[in-house]
Amino acid sequence: MTKALDGVRVLDFTHVQSGPTCTQLLAWFGADVIKVERPGSGDITRGQLQDIPKVDSLYFTMLNHNKRSITLDTKNPKGKEVLTALIRTCDVLVENFGPGVLDRMGFTWEKIQEINPRMIVASIKGFGPGPYEDCKVYENVAQCTGGAASTTGFREGLPLVTGAQIGDSGTGLHLALGIVTALYQRHHTGRGQRVTAAMQDGVLNLCRVKLRDQQRLDHGPLKEYSQFGEGIPFGDAVPRAGNDSGGGQPGRILKCKGWEQDPNAYIYVITQAPVWEKICDVIGETGWKTHPDYATPPARLSRLNEIFARIEQWTMTKTKFEAMEILNADDIPCGPILSMKELAEDQSLRATGTIVEVDHPTRGKYLSVGNPIKLSDSPTEVKRSPLLGEHTDEILRDVLGYSDAHVAEIHDSGATAPPRKQAAE
């Protein structure tokens, strides 16, 4: 079966997380992704957070599936020759270097267009044009500058970053969409274009409901926030709201049976208006169905702490899975707090390919996330990440058409590895 992106060749100059997230998604959809790495060391994440000495880390392997690796010293004249040839034959170049790095390598946008007018150049940067565009950005910096940290946490506590990598992986996913869109437009124009995704922009895009709330503040308090019911005045910026729901339907994380020993024995419950009477039945407060202080959503807004405390009295008598089963039977929105251990052992996620087991030649079998996007006519087969430079000769021969003698010349120049030592006669 053909893949959705069969025939698309991607030159992958990315490293760490944001860029590799993007190129891995393209590879999962069938693109031929050629990862360009520094001879001798490669992507820095190969050696970061290693759990097994002298073996590619999970940090690297889980972000670089389905790719081919070529080692290339782009400062070496022969290395630059190879890179130029790759630009000529590839469809997309993806990079997440610091500002200006690609230009200093001698490959400006204008130069790339001269080599291959159909080339799409996709870049991840920390910030878009403006006062901060030259600043270096990592995951937590992006969360802090994109509005996530200021709106995450509890009102009286510090701003918090999330466990989800919305800055790195989130921006990588945005860039992948931009690349596919540019490829589609190229069918009509015949030309490549630049595609840029800034990490600050990506985080802010995912925080759009908080930008919504910022504007709502101009017209009065945010009544679904718990501080409204507590009589605490709002300031001029969206506050941190703990675990209050961001969708306008009040919700909280509540304790379940065993919470004293299990840090994840909790469930999230939403008091959605259409199922309010069913909630009252479940928790044994049938009088609340008609009581003027509880019967309508506006009346309940000032009593959310009391209401959720009562619901929690009920959830504490059930395990999180028991509570979920009972609530789901009445279409009451809820979800257990699942630990990474529980997710890793969830057989339904294995069955759908959301979690996959991958076999690696040096580290053995490990678990990874699979493709979260399922295409009926282009199923994803997750293949292991490449060893450093594993496909160098294959790419030189099969992609660029180099002869054995030309490949040997490239190697001897030191463009792909230190020059070979001559054997003593």
From Swiss-Prot:
<feature type="binding site">
    <location>
        <begin position="72"/>
        <end position="75"/>
    </location>
    <ligand>
        <name>CoA</name>
    </ligand>
</feature>
<comment type="subunit">
    <text>Homodimer.</text>
</comment>
<feature type="binding site">
    <location>
        <begin position="136"/>
        <end position="139"/>
    </location>
    <ligand>
        <name>CoA</name>
    </ligand>
</feature>
<dbReference type="Pfam" id="PF02515">
    <property type="entry name" value="CoA_transf_3"/>
</dbReference>
<comment type="pathway">
    <text>Metabolic intermediate degradation; oxalate degradation; CO(2) and formate from oxalate: step 1/2.</text>
</comment>
<feature type="binding site">
    <location>
        <position position="38"/>
    </location>
    <ligand>
        <name>CoA</name>
    </ligand>
</feature>
<dbReference type="InterPro" id="IPR003673">
    <property type="entry name" value="CoA-Trfase_fam_III"/>
</dbReference>
<dbReference type="InterPro" id="IPR050483">
    <property type="entry name" value="CoA-transferase_III_domain"/>
</dbReference>
<dbReference type="GO" id="GO:0033608">
    <property type="term" value="F:formyl-CoA transferase activity"/>
</dbReference>
<feature type="active site" description="Nucleophile">
    <location>
        <position position="168"/>
    </location>
</feature>
<dbReference type="InterPro" id="IPR017659">
    <property type="entry name" value="Formyl_CoA_transfer"/>
</dbReference>
<dbReference type="InterPro" id="IPR044855">
    <property type="entry name" value="CoA-Trfase_III_dom3_sf"/>
</dbReference>
<feature type="binding site">
    <location>
        <begin position="247"/>
        <end position="249"/>
    </location>
    <ligand>
        <name>substrate</name>
    </ligand>
</feature>
<feature type="binding site">
    <location>
        <position position="104"/>
    </location>
    <ligand>
        <name>CoA</name>
    </ligand>
</feature>
<keyword id="KW-0808">Transferase</keyword>
<comment type="similarity">
    <text>Belongs to the CoA-transferase III family. Frc subfamily.</text>
</comment>
<comment type="function">
    <text>Involved in the catabolism of oxalate and in the adapatation to low pH via the induction of the oxalate-dependent acid tolerance response (ATR). Catalyzes the transfer of the CoA moiety from formyl-CoA to oxalate.</text>
</comment>
<feature type="binding site">
    <location>
        <begin position="96"/>
        <end position="98"/>
    </location>
    <ligand>
        <name>CoA</name>
    </ligand>
</feature>
<dbReference type="GO" id="GO:0033611">
    <property type="term" value="P:oxalate catabolic process"/>
</dbReference>
<protein>
    <recommendedName>
        <fullName>Formyl-CoA:oxalate CoA-transferase</fullName>
        <ecNumber>2.8.3.16</ecNumber>
    </recommendedName>
</protein>
<feature type="binding site">
    <location>
        <begin position="17"/>
        <end position="18"/>
    </location>
    <ligand>
        <name>CoA</name>
    </ligand>
</feature>
<dbReference type="InterPro" id="IPR023606">
    <property type="entry name" value="CoA-Trfase_III_dom_1_sf"/>
</dbReference>
